[in-house]
Amino acid sequence: AQVMLMAVALVLMLAAVPRAAVAIDCGHVDSLVRPCLSYVQGGPGPSGQCCDGVKNLHNQARSQSDRQSACNCLKGIARGIHNLNEDNARSIPPKCGVNLPYTISLNIDCSRV
């Protein structure tokens, strides 16, 4: 009984310890912006799903570290897109009603976002 009480106390103590925030990972970023793929390849849009993903990403990337992680992920994703239309990619935030304090490009310095 005493061992069980100690185990319960340990679980409660661990549950009370604040966890470090997990940085935004590229798999998550990719899943959010994947609906934008046809538009950044020159198709019509951006779609409602694309805008929802961009808005969600913007809302989740609150800290500078999160913004830098998301930026680096987006650069990597963009480099892998065949027939990337950079003008369409740059137009997504304003067309989706997302105000970014920087311009999206393949050459963006993510340490400055």
From Swiss-Prot:
Q: Does the keyword Cell cycle apply?
A: no
Q: Keywords on this record?
A: Disulfide bond, Lipid-binding, Lipoprotein, Signal, Transport
- Lipid attachment points (Cis-14-hydroxy-10,13-dioxo-7-heptadecenoic acid aspartate ester): D30
Keyword check for Oxidoreductase: no
Disulfide-linked positions: C26-C73, C36-C50, C51-C96, C71-C110
The Swiss-Prot or TrEMBL record annotates one GO molecular function as: lipid binding
Signal peptide, first to last residue: 1-24
A GO BP entry: lipid transport
Q: Which family does it belong to?
A: Belongs to the plant LTP family.
PANTHER family on file: NON-SPECIFIC LIPID-TRANSFER PROTEIN 2-RELATED
Q: What does this protein do?
A: Plant non-specific lipid-transfer proteins transfer phospholipids as well as galactolipids across membranes. May play a role in wax or cutin deposition in the cell walls of expanding epidermal cells and certain secretory tissues.
Could you identify this protein by its name?
Non-specific lipid-transfer protein
